[in-house]
Amino acid sequence: MNVIRIYGKDFTFCELLYTFVAIFKKRIPVSMQTIQVKDKSFSLFISEKEILREIKRIAKQINKDFQDKEPVFLAVLNGSFIFAADLLKEVNLPSEISFVKLSAYQGVTTTGKIREVIGLNVDLTDRPVIIVEDIVDTGLTMAHMLDVLKQQNPASIDICTLLLKPGKLQVDLDIKYCCMEIPNDFIVGYGLDYDGYGRNMRDIYTLIKN
């Protein structure tokens, strides 16, 4: 496991992430009914209280399903970092977590095809794997990620997503753990962004359409 030394003290990447999220949340404004992110306005859609309630529900199911197992959680950056931190705090299993990014084929922007998973530092052979994602919409990127991960011969692969847009799915995915299904609206907050902004909001907001 990678260790980072800061002021003479060693930290794992996960420890730094949890610390960062805790500090991040302390500086986040309290819930607001409407927010402005760059040139767009958004209204409150899902409160932090609702989000955390659903995360606890999902974590409880994961604890039950993976009892006596040691799963590997693969949290997909950038969007899932807050979700992953809150989820793992509710998981009481011996487990590992790796924060990964997806590398797309150059010039491909609509097919979702990826060529590799960057940052994976855990051997997945014969290990149960849980992919942690912020949102699944078309499902194309997730489907290709599954193809890439299967080449490492894990014991199993399950998908855990904070949000799912069933009306936008273009592929058949078996999503075992889903906190909430939502309509096909543009949203920000709790890790989700608009042009890089808005990830730091405690709640999830939906675009106000003119």
Model regions and ranges:
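PRPP-associated nucleotide enzymes
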Residues: 2-9, 13-210
